[in-house]
């Protein structure tokens, strides 16, 4: 009898152990070593996020924020907001801590001097923070090079500033915006991009704001630096192979911190049978500076030159550029004698940007010519 009771007790104990073991959760059975490994992975993930660069995206509108389900040429620019742009490229979170601000949301033909000042001041303020490693500005491509060059001359920081756009609206088939935006964030977060001035990133290419220009109305590879070349390319990694020798960003003499407006500078275009009256009209309209897009080496017809000289005598600064799209405009002959300045290698639209800023400091033609030779 005692033996039977003893056997029953052993059987009951065994069954109890079996059921208790089966009811344990996987977590309860996890060894201390496994727990340590799990915590280590979680900690590494948080550490990775903290190690990523912090990039601020400032959106201004343009095609990259445009909408059209099928057309790549007929669409409404400046419709999609910055948060939607960021959400459309979730992969950016793997390479940077990204957040956005909507500065304006317009087609880039509507970017005016007021917007340039607002954007430039905001970029400067953000980059003055130790918590921000780089800036990306989304922008319409039509005037992108002008904004990029403005930032190149006015932001006093060696942290990366990247201006990006797209040639196809964000909702179109084969939109180039998401890839361009991802690459822009990648470049803005790269240590190697520091000190290179404002950069323009599209189509897997990195260009300097000083030299790049839009060359085609619809092609995705429209932005080129014909004479100087790109300064880098983007593949799995970022490859820089060129340096900028012109003054820019932190070495620039120009400051917009106390400015609430910029001088009026107009662009006139040279052609056969042009006249002097356009110079008179610009002066009458309040121009403080005029950029003349001349033929060849910034050439003016006799009639146009008379108008330019009259403008100079009335205190208006006149700079000769070229309509050819490339090459250096040189100082020579009667042009120098008449204080008709040369834009060096700046195209008319960028010459206008530099002349506006130059006129905030001086109206001395010799000093302004020095600016064009240095910047």
Model regions: which residues?
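Bacterial N-terminal signal peptides that target proteins for export
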Residues: 1-10
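C-terminal motif of bacterial Sec signal peptides marking the signal peptidase cleavage site
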Residues: 20-21
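ATP/NTP phosphate-donor binding region
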Residues: 34-35, 39-124, 306
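ATP/nucleoside-binding phosphotransfer catalytic cores, i.e., glycine-rich phosphate-binding loops
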Residues: 43-44, 49, 277, 302-375
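Accessory alpha-helical/coil subdomains and C-terminal extensions
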Residues: 52, 58, 65-68, 81, ...
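Short Gly/Thr/Asp-enriched flexible loops that form oxyanion-binding sites at enzyme active sites
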Residues: 137-159, 300-309
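Short, acidic/small-residue loops that bind anionic groups at enzyme active sites
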Residues: 148-178, 185-189, 313-322
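Internal gly/pro-rich beta-alpha loop/helix module
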Residues: 164-235
């Amino acid at each position: 009898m005692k033996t039977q009771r003893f056997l029953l007790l052993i059987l009951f104990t065994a069954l109890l152990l079996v059921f208790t073991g089966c009811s344990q959760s996987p977590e309860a059975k996890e060894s201390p070593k496994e727990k340590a490994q799990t915590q280590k992975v979680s900690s590494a993930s948080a550490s990775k996020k903290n190690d990523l660069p912090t990039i601020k995206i400032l959106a201004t509108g343009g095609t990259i924020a445009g909408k059209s389900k099928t057309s790549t040429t007929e669409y409404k620019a400046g419709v999609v907001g910055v948060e939607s742009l960021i959400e459309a490229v979730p992969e950016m979170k793997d390479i940077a801590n990204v957040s956005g601000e909507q500065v304006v949301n317009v087609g880039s033909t509507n970017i005016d001097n007021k917007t340039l000042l607002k954007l430039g001041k905001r970029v400067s303020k953000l980059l003055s923070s130790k918590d921000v490693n780089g800036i990306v500005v989304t922008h319409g491509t039509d005037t992108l090079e002008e904004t990029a060059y403005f930032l190149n001359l006015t932001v006093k920081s060696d942290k990366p500033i990247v201006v990006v756009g797209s040639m196809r609206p964000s909702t179109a088939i084969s939109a180039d915006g998401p890839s361009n935006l991802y690459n822009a964030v990648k470049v803005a977060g790269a240590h190697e991009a520091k000190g290179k001035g404002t950069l323009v990133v599209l189509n897997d290419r990195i260009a300097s704001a000083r030299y790049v220009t839009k060359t085609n109305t619809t092609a995705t590879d429209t932005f080129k630096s014909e004479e100087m070349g790109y300064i880098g390319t983007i593949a799995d990694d970022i490859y820089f192979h060129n340096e900028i020798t012109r003054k820019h960003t932190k070495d620039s003499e120009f400051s917009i911190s106390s400015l609430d407006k910029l001088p009026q500078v107009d662009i006139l275009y040279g052609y056969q049978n042009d006249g002097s009256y356009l110079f008179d009209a610009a002066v009458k309209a309040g121009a403080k500076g005029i950029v003349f897009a001349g033929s060849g080496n910034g050439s003016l017809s006799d009639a146009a030159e008379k108008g330019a000289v009259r403008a100079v005598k009335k205190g208006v600064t006149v700079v000769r550029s070229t309509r050819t799209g490339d090459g250096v405009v040189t100082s020579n002959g009667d042009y120098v004698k008449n204080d008709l300045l040369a834009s060096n290698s700046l195209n008319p639209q960028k010459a206008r940007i530099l002349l506006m800023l130059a006129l905030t400091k001086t109206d001395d033609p010799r000093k302004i010519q020095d600016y064009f030779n240095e910047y």
